[in-house]
């Protein structure tokens, strides 16, 4: 039975540098606004399935 083991250290990788770093501040602001708009559209989706479930629970039940 081995009493020791070899442990490799972690490898650190640098994240890729975005092209936004090279853009001037007006281009950077425009890109950030566009990205924020895409996130907002996804966050504010109508969630039709949730709305339908609420409507279904509000319907009177048949007895």
Curated annotation (Swiss-Prot):
InterPro entries in alphabetical order: DUF2735
Organism, scientific name: Rhizobium leguminosarum
Function of the molecule: Inhibits the synthesis of glutamine synthetase II.
Name of the protein: Glutamine synthetase translation inhibitor
């Amino acid at each position: 039975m081995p009493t020791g083991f070899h442990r490799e250290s972690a490898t650190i990788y640098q994240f890729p540098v975005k092209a936004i770093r090279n853009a001037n501040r007006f281009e950077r602001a425009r890109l950030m606004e566009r990205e924020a708009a895409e996130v907002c559209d996804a966050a504010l989706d109508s969630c039709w399935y949730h709305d339908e479930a609420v409507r279904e629970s509000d319907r009177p039940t048949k007895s």
